[in-house]
Each structure stands twice: as C-alpha cells, then as structure tokens.
C-alpha cells in the first residue's frame, strides 16, 4: 500500500491545490486558509438568519453556510440575499443540502457554493445488508449520475462552486456494503461524485471528510490526499471535526483533527464545529488558521527518516513495560499522565500534591506520576524523604546546568526515575552507559530528554543501549515542533521497544490547550506515546494542566475518564435548543465515566454520526425526541419534557448508571 499522503511527515510543506472561487473568496492555491462557519437559525426566518450572518462576517468569518432542507427554505434565500445587500454584506453563502436534489436546484440560483453529502444526496439510508455485484454497483452509479448531473451542470453554468462533503455517519448503504464504515468508504463515497462532476467538465470542487472521532477524520483526509495523488486530482480540502461538542472538549477535538492535518500540509479552508453560539467558532478557527498562514515550508532536516506508521489506521507503537511499584506504563497499558511540580521545601511540595489529589478527586482521577522540576542537588535528600509519604512515583528532572558527578549519581538512586539530557550532563558516553546500567540493576528507570535539534546526534544511542542490554530507558524531547520531531524520534526508535513520553512545555494554559492538542494529540492518534507530560511555568496553572492532560486523552478516545459527549453544532434543522439541552443532559450524566452519549439536533446527522455512542438523544420533531441505544431506536417521539428522565432510565436499564458521588 502507498502510505504517502503529503510531501513528508517530518517537516512542513502545504499541499498544492487548485484555486476554487466561492464568490470573491479564493480557496486553495497559494491563498491563506479560509475560515468559515454556519448559522443555526431557521432559514425561513429572514431577520434571524441575516443577523447571524452579519455577526459572523463581523467576527472574521469569510464564508457562511446555512441549511436548506426544504423548498420553503430555498424560496426564502432571495429575501436573505436582499437584506444582506442592503446591509452591505459581501460574504459568500453556502447552501447545505441533504436528501433533496430538487431543493438544491432552487438554492443554487442564490448562493456562491452548494454543499452536498454524497451519502444521502441520491440515497435514502435503510441500513440494508446486501451484496452488490459489479454490474449492480455500476447501475447504482448510473442512477446517482442521473440525479446528480443536473445540479453539476447548473453549478457550471452559474459559476457556483460545490463542496462534496462526506460524513462518516451518513455513508450510503451501497458504500457501507462494499467498503464498510471506514475511512476508505468515506473516500470512495466522495470519489464517485467527483468522477461524475469531472465527466461533465466541472472542477470547481472542494472536498471534506468529516467525522466526530478525530482519529477517523484524520485517517480519512490522509487517505483522500493519497488517492488524489494517485488520480492526479488537486481539489482543495475543507477540514472539520463534526459534532466536536462544546467548551474545552470541543476545542481539543477540533485542534487534534484540524491542527494535525494542517501540520501535515493538508487543508485550505476550515470550520470549527462547536455546540455554542456560531460566533464563538470563529476565534478558534482563526487561531488555528493564523498559525499555519504564517508557517513557511521547512524540509531542511527530513533526510534519513523513513515512514514507520500506517497513516490510514491506528496501530499503537509497541514498547516494553515500565513498572514502578503500582505504576505501570508502556506495553498494553493505558497512556499515563505525569505531572510536573516545583520544590521549595517539603511542606509546600506535599501541600501542592495534596491540592492535586483533591482536585483529581473532583474529576474522579488520581494523580499517577510526579516529576520534580529542576531541584537543587542539596534538595534531593529532602525530596526523597517527602516522597516516602506518597504512593505514586516521584522522579527528578535535572536542571540543564547540573553535571552528573559520581556523588549526585549515587543520590539519584533514591528516585525511581530521573530525567536528563545526555548531551548536557555527560561529557563521557561510557560513564553515561555505566550510570544507566547501575540504575537498571537497581530496578530504576531513566528518561533521556533532549532538544529536537539534537535528534541526528541521538540516532546511534538506541543501538548502543540494546547491544549492552539496557532496557529501563524511555525517550522524550523538548521541542517547539512537537509533531515532526517526535515522528523523527519514532522513526529512530521503530526497531526498538523503548517507551516514548510526549512532553510539551508552554507559556500559558490556552497555548497548552491548542498546541498540545495539535502536537501531542496528533501523535497519540497515530499510536505514538506511552506517557504524556504537559506543563507551564506557573504553579497556579497546575490544576488546569492536570485536567487538560486527561481531556486530551479523552479527545483522542484513547482513555475515557469522564462521560464522552458527541453533540452537533446546531443549525436551522435543529429541533430544540441544542446548547441548553446539551448542558442539561451533562448536568444529569456528567459523572458516568466512560459512557458515551450523543446529543443530536435532528436525524440528518443523527443515528450514523452518533458513531460508537452508547446512547443517543435525537430531535424527531417539534417537542419530540427519539432515544437510542447504540444505533437502535428504543423510544420514539418522547415528549421533550420527560426525555431527560427517560434517557437516565434507559442508562439504568442497561446497567451503566451509577449515582453521583456526594464528595
């Protein structure tokens, strides 16, 4: 299989795409990454729609999408256009179409772009299981072409662009039966429609591969880019994690998916989908776009590194086990979290640890490992004595200006793990190997931690360690280019079983949230990393960073430490106040660790886009809700006044309920 989907996974270069115009906005080519969003008002409500469009435009949104589910919505587009013209608005509009080709033919007259979903534009999903012969499959494609071609020809005639937007949760029965519920199915779904458009000489196409799980979404976009390379296609990519949710969780999921793809050079326009006021999506999108609009190509240090991943599926990078008393990491253990704490004296240190435990208790999480940040050598004895009061390992991060003399090496045998830079703290390589051997013989671990620019110098070390039987070593990096440098480290270590700790040091919690989600999150969804360690320079940030670390693991779906919510961003199809409903359901179910609950505004992105949710709460009509167990409807048309209680009872009936703690 050809794993190549970009220029290189080890450095930045944006993928070259064709330029597609959406009104006066240019997407792809050499243009900056374009920001877009979607209003959530009813499209038949002229004033409400215009108000939201203008608010988004003022916030910096460059393209605005609105849902057009019915003929009545399409008929109101001229009124919206007229009011926008009066207000002096020039923002291009996109009509979002599901199920209704006839409505698309009306809407195309009044918008700059049409978005169609290849999973439901010409198909009604019946969840039917059947074998398609090649003949039958081709007959289905001919049927689709008959339905789709009139819209393509009208777009071509009017100069209207189109997004062919696949959703993981709404693949057609035809695709599901041939390719399954997979990234490959998502890609082939879009390619079927692209080929029809190309056969009619139409190329003003933008493509998206959206999913609520960032891991699936990233794999699908990579596979699409790889197929584009094979087929000599150069269409721009619209990036987005659908149903990301709200708050930090929604921002983390979006940054993992969108940000890691932008690092790969993929993406020409982005939409951050939050279950919040649409205006609040724009600053998040701008933050992500600005980072990469300023980024320049850098392929200077990529030679000598080879692809060691399958970028289209998840496979955890195998490593040997780290076992310190009750602490276990690596091998098949969950990804662990290490917390950095300062040390002034025993009292303040133990007080900070106690605060961390107390905060962790409120999250139903206990701290797992602590690293003391750059203590003075004469503090080691006091730290060792303080650590005896704790049931979790306490390690030492050596200051860069500390030389590891023999006296200090002996004192460090009191600690289960130390972190050091081999290029700064040892002048003699043989002495370093002797030190590592001594620690291993004592059942202790050592973390080799150096800067990303020293990777070339690090290349031979794993071979040397393996030759002399040193196994109790893990590797980490201090780097501003977390994704690229850790991939290089992964390439170096791909023949070995040394564990990898993903380290990120940031100036403040907001920077930590976005950059750790992009860098560390982007690595985790590829199976790289056995532990994570995120820090800022301020002790006051420790609780926030502690929670961020576990939220990041939650966002990658590698470790669920709280209820997982899959909630759509709301649009004109939504049949209830999604923000209020989501908040209400969270207040009732937020303590159900590991349970996955989907909250969907309507059926379009309902059952399918719930992905692997255990339970679903989906709008069925005004004041009515369908409740799901998995993808199966178990209660239909439940009055919204009692739907929350019925959901709780459904969870109880399936023995996944636990009463909230009184703590």
Curated annotation (Swiss-Prot):
<dbReference type="GO" id="GO:0019288">
    <property type="term" value="P:isopentenyl diphosphate biosynthetic process, methylerythritol 4-phosphate pathway"/>
</dbReference>
<dbReference type="InterPro" id="IPR011005">
    <property type="entry name" value="Dihydropteroate_synth-like_sf"/>
</dbReference>
<comment type="function">
    <text>Converts 2C-methyl-D-erythritol 2,4-cyclodiphosphate (ME-2,4cPP) into 1-hydroxy-2-methyl-2-(E)-butenyl 4-diphosphate.</text>
</comment>
<dbReference type="GO" id="GO:0051539">
    <property type="term" value="F:4 iron, 4 sulfur cluster binding"/>
</dbReference>
<keyword id="KW-0408">Iron</keyword>
<comment type="pathway">
    <text>Isoprenoid biosynthesis; isopentenyl diphosphate biosynthesis via DXP pathway; isopentenyl diphosphate from 1-deoxy-D-xylulose 5-phosphate: step 5/6.</text>
</comment>
<dbReference type="GO" id="GO:0141197">
    <property type="term" value="F:4-hydroxy-3-methylbut-2-enyl-diphosphate synthase activity (flavodoxin)"/>
</dbReference>
<dbReference type="InterPro" id="IPR004588">
    <property type="entry name" value="IspG_bac-typ"/>
</dbReference>
<dbReference type="Pfam" id="PF04551">
    <property type="entry name" value="GcpE"/>
</dbReference>
<protein>
    <recommendedName>
        <fullName>4-hydroxy-3-methylbut-2-en-1-yl diphosphate synthase (flavodoxin)</fullName>
        <ecNumber>1.17.7.3</ecNumber>
    </recommendedName>
</protein>
<comment type="similarity">
    <text>Belongs to the IspG family.</text>
</comment>
<dbReference type="InterPro" id="IPR017178">
    <property type="entry name" value="IspG_atypical"/>
</dbReference>
<keyword id="KW-0004">4Fe-4S</keyword>
<dbReference type="InterPro" id="IPR045854">
    <property type="entry name" value="NO2/SO3_Rdtase_4Fe4S_sf"/>
</dbReference>
<feature type="binding site">
    <location>
        <position position="571"/>
    </location>
    <ligand>
        <name>[4Fe-4S] cluster</name>
    </ligand>
</feature>
<dbReference type="GO" id="GO:0046429">
    <property type="term" value="F:4-hydroxy-3-methylbut-2-en-1-yl diphosphate synthase activity (ferredoxin)"/>
</dbReference>
<keyword id="KW-0560">Oxidoreductase</keyword>
<feature type="binding site">
    <location>
        <position position="602"/>
    </location>
    <ligand>
        <name>[4Fe-4S] cluster</name>
    </ligand>
</feature>
<feature type="binding site">
    <location>
        <position position="568"/>
    </location>
    <ligand>
        <name>[4Fe-4S] cluster</name>
    </ligand>
</feature>
<dbReference type="GO" id="GO:0005506">
    <property type="term" value="F:iron ion binding"/>
</dbReference>
<dbReference type="GO" id="GO:0016114">
    <property type="term" value="P:terpenoid biosynthetic process"/>
</dbReference>
<keyword id="KW-0411">Iron-sulfur</keyword>
<feature type="binding site">
    <location>
        <position position="609"/>
    </location>
    <ligand>
        <name>[4Fe-4S] cluster</name>
    </ligand>
</feature>
<keyword id="KW-0414">Isoprene biosynthesis</keyword>
<keyword id="KW-0479">Metal-binding</keyword>
């Amino acid at each position: 299989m050809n794993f190549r989907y970009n220029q290189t996974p080890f450095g930045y270069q944006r993928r070259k795409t064709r330029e597609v115009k959406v009104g006066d906005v240019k997407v792809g080519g050499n243009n900056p990454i374009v920001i877009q969003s979607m209003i959530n008002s009813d499209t038949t409500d002229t004033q409400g729609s215009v108000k939201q469009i203008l608010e988004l435009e003022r916030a910096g949104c460059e393209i605005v999408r609105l849902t057009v589910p019915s003929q009545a919505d399409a008929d109101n587009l001229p009124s919206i256009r007229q009011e926008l013209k009066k207000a002096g608005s020039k923002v291009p509009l996109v009509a979002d179409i599901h199920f209704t080709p006839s409505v698309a033919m009306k809407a195309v007259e009044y918008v700059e772009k049409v978005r169609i979903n290849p999973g439901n534009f010409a198909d009604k999903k019946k969840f039917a299981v059947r074998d398609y012969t090649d003949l039958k499959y081709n007959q289905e494609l001919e049927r689709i072409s008959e339905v789709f071609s009139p819209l393509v020809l009208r777009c071509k005639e009017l100069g209207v662009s189109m997004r062919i937007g696949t959703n993981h949760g709404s693949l057609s029965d035809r695709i599901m039966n041939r390719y399954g519920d997979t990234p490959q199915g998502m890609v082939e779904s879009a390619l079927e429609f692209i080929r029809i458009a190309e056969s009619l000489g139409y190329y003003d196409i933008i493509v998206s591969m959206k999913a609520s799980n960032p891991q699936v979404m990233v794999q699908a976009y990579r596979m699409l880019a790889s197929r584009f390379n094979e087929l000599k296609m150069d269409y721009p990519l619209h990036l987005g994690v659908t149903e990301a949710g709200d708050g930090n969780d929604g921002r983390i999921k979006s940054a993992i998916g969108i940000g890691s793809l932008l690092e790969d050079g993929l993406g020409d326009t982005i939409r951050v989908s939050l279950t919040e006021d649409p205006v609040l999506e724009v600053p998040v999108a701008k933050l992500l776009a600005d980072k990469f609009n300023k980024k320049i190509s850098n392929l200077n240090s990529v030679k000598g590194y080879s692809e060691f991943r399958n970028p289209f599926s998840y496979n955890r990078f195998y490593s040997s086990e780290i076992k310190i008393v009750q602490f276990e990491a690596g091998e098949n253990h969950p990804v662990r979290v290490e917390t950095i704490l300062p040390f002034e004296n025993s009292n303040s240190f133990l007080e900070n640890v106690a605060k961390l435990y107390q905060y962790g208790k409120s999250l139903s999480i206990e701290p797992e490992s602590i690293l003391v940040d750059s203590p003075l050598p004469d503090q080691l004895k006091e730290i060792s004595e303080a650590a005896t009061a704790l049931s979790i390992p306490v390690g030492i991060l050596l200051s860069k200006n500390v030389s590891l003399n023999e006296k200090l090496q002996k004192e460090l045998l009191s600690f289960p793990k130390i972190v050091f830079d081999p290029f700064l703290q040892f002048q003699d390589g043989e002495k370093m190997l002797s030190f590592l051997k001594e620690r291993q013989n004592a059942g202790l671990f050592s973390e080799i931690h150096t800067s990303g620019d020293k990777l070339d110098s690090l290349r031979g070390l794993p071979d040397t360690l393996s030759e002399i039987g040193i196994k109790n070593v893990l590797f980490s990096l201090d780097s501003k280019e977390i994704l690229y440098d850790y991939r290089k480290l992964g390439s170096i270590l791909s023949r070995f079983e040394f564990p990898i700790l993903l380290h990120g040091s940031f100036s403040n919690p907001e920077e930590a949230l976005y950059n750790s989600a992009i860098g560390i999150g982007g690595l985790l969804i590829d199976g790289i990393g056995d532990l994570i360690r995120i820090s800022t320079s301020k002790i006051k940030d420790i609780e926030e960073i502690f929670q961020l670390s576990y939220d990041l693991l939650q966002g990658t779906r590698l470790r669920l430490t709280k209820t997982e919510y899959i909630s759509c961003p709301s649009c004109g199809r939504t049949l209830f106040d999604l923000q209020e409903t989501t908040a209400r359901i969270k207040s009732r179910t937020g303590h159900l660790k590991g349970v996955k609950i989907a909250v969907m505004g309507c059926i379009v992105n309902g059952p399918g886009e719930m992905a692997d949710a255990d339970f679903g709460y989906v709008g069925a009509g005004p004041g009515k809700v369908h409740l799901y167990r998995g993808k199966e409807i178990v209660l239909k048309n439940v009055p919204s006044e009692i739907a929350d209680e019925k959901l709780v009872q459904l969870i109880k009936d399936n023995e996944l309920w636990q009463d909230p703690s009184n703590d």
